[in-house]
């Protein structure tokens, strides 16, 4: 059976590895085919058309084919639209990529998550410090929901009891959403959790999730970080450790 060729596929490079003196292995997030591994033959040659294009956090359209685990990249076209993020925004973009590399299975399509990623990268490229943390929280929520690791945020996980709007609740990796205890430093009101659930529901836009994070971004950051580290199986993500090391200089 002939191998399938995919053309004009929206994609972002998540990571790239040296494969030979002249070629690269790419880990690519595509809209309709999920996370795929591609070999870009000759991409390291000075004359290669791939050389200036295969960069992280840049929107591409790619064509690839083959029936092996690592398929052949046939073409790649930069779609433009924004500049490369820099500074904290660049490190935040690498953080998003590390999350996708750790949590997404290969060849598992998530078109809505891809759209959320693209929207987040555009916000990072805008270099607006006021939206950076909001964009990260909104994407983390969309990622966890998209891969089935986020419980419903309008009910206690253990009992399915609807949240009381004025009661405080916390999201715990092992137990889901529960009532906050006196020693829980970070918690959200039931109304805030319900607003997040509503923003994540149905066919809502990424901007809805972004807006719902405005009132609770700091408290949400601590809880989502613990949940993500738990599911990634690490104490600290590499990109987060890099951020902490740079801040300590």
From Swiss-Prot:
InterPro entries: ARFGAP/RecO (IPR037278), DNA_rep/recomb_RecO_N (IPR022572), NA-bd_OB-fold (IPR012340), RecO (IPR003717), RecO_C (IPR042242). GO terms for biological process: DNA recombination; double-strand break repair. One of its GO terms (cellular component) is bacterial nucleoid. The keyword DNA repair applies. Keywords: DNA damage, DNA recombination, DNA repair. Disulfide bonds: none annotated. Pfam families: RecO_C, RecO_N. PANTHER family: DNA REPAIR PROTEIN RECO. Belongs to the RecO family. NCBIfam families: reco. Involved in DNA repair and RecF pathway recombination. This is DNA repair protein RecO. It comes from Polaromonas naphthalenivorans (strain CJ2).
């Amino acid at each position: 059976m002939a191998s399938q060729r995919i053309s004009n596929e929206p994609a972002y490079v998540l990571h790239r590895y040296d494969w030979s003196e002249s070629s690269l292995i790419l880990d690519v997030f595509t809209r309709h085919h999920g996370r795929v591994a591609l070999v870009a033959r000759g991409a390291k040659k000075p004359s290669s058309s791939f050389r200036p294009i295969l960069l992280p956090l840049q929107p591409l359209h790619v064509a690839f084919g083959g029936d092996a685990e690592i398929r052949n990249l046939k073409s790649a076209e930069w779609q433009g639209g924004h500049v490369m993020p820099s500074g904290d925004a660049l490190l935040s973009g690498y953080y998003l990529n590390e999350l996708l590399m750790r949590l997404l299975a290969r060849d598992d399509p998530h078109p809505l998550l891809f759209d959320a990623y693209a929207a987040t990268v555009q916000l990072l490229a805008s270099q607006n410090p006021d939206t950076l943390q909001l964009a990260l929280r909104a994407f983390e929520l969309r990622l966890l929901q998209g891969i089935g690791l986020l419980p419903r945020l309008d009910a206690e996980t253990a009992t399915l009891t609807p949240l009381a709007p004025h009661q405080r609740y916390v999201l715990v990796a092992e137990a889901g959403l529960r009532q906050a205890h006196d020693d829980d430093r970070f918690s959200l009101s039931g109304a805030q959790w319900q607003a997040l659930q509503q923003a994540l529901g149905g066919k809502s836009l990424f901007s809805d999730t972004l807006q719902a994070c405005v009132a609770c971004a700091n408290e949400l950051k601590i809880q989502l970080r613990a949940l993500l580290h738990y599911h990634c199986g690490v104490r600290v993500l590499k990109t987060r450790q890099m951020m902490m090391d740079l801040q300590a200089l």
